[in-house]
């Protein structure tokens, strides 16, 4: 009897809870649905008369309905690897589909569309077969890190929603592709715009590695010592990161097609977005042709000679070249300290035969200040005479530096891919890269069963690898260099275009 009474009470409570849930959830769902429908109507009304030429169909081609693809790339005039992905992807779509019209949402309002396309031709040698329209966004500052000195991830993400709303209400495409990693624009265009949605992710906005580093209280460029030395602040930041990661995962899960640039990015995006069936690795296009043309002249005086070479004369310089912007995450101090560790094992009379050349661009005062501090570090380590800073060099000068170098050096922890590493391999350098991220998982891997370079993770291992490389015979160096050069065909523009077209095809089937 008591047992039946308890069961009755439980059933009654369950029914009551269900009724209250229906009473609360149904009106909320109804209101949310009405809001979404209203915003969809508002978006279509706002962008109805924008760029009418994109929807124009000639009388002779009434059988073709144009499909407009919008690319969200607020910094499309930057001239970096992300922009090469953008323009190569657009060219691939235009060559494949004659009915495709392309729009680029950009914040580069200080230049014209013609100037942007001209720079793409000059920088990447990419000419588009069809015209491209530009929607110039006025509020790009909302996604700039400098706008948010604190809670930068949160600020930039909210800013990307606002910038995405400006893009959405300026012009509504049929297909939306984010090529810069602004995941919070994806639900906007899918649910409020009714678009087919895809994205190309260069690196996750937040990763499990970032969570681990904060949890272990390690100091880094994005985890200040003030926080890492405080248990309370570290816990607060960890909670903030976890909440942000959940929100980021929900936004990313709205994508119907996800392309990532490396195995490292793939694993992190998969753990956050949970879209395994929709996610594919498409290596970014690397222009290796100009570097492959450089001869592999192992054994010439001053050009990739080794400690075992007969030309080890007073005027023979064995150079190590590092290529990368002077940003904190590139970890140039590790390069200097590793080089110092390597030189300590050399006789004083032989140290002048080795040179570390840091090639990179100085974009602003922050970069200049970092270079100044690096010069000071080289002075403090007493290696300033063996270190050269090549700032803002021309492409021709870059090729000359790589042509003479024995080692191509890379020290960034968990770099998502590593185009600079690919360029060093293509040029004939022996690569010494960080044992993490894209270089470890995708680039400096065995090719046809043979090594393509070396990996290290701290001063001691970098110095030891430098010693090993310089001690190789010319024949051993030649085998590694030729093998590495053959392996970079995986990262060609043709390989990227094929992968990009295969991944984006479902977006056009559903339009």
Regions found by a protein language model. Give the residues of each.
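A charged, aromatic-enriched C-terminal amphipathic alpha-helix characteristic of glycosyltransferases
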Residues: 457, 471-511
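Conserved donor-binding/catalytic core segment of Leloir-type glycosyltransferases
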Residues: 71, 259, 299-330, 336-341, ...
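Nucleotide-activated donor-binding/catalytic signature segment of Leloir-type glycosyltransferases, i.e.
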Residues: 125-128, 368-396
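Short alpha-helical donor nucleotide-sugar binding micro-motif in glycosyltransferases
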Residues: 392, 400-405
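Aromatic "clamp/platform" in nucleotide-sugar-dependent glycosyltransferases that forms part
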Residues: 413
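A conserved mid-protein helix/loop that constitutes part of the nucleotide-sugar donor-binding site
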Residues: 80-88, 318, 325-347, 369-372
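Membrane-proximal helix-turn-helix segments that form the acceptor-binding/catalytic region
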Residues: 165-166, 205, 217, 221-258, ...
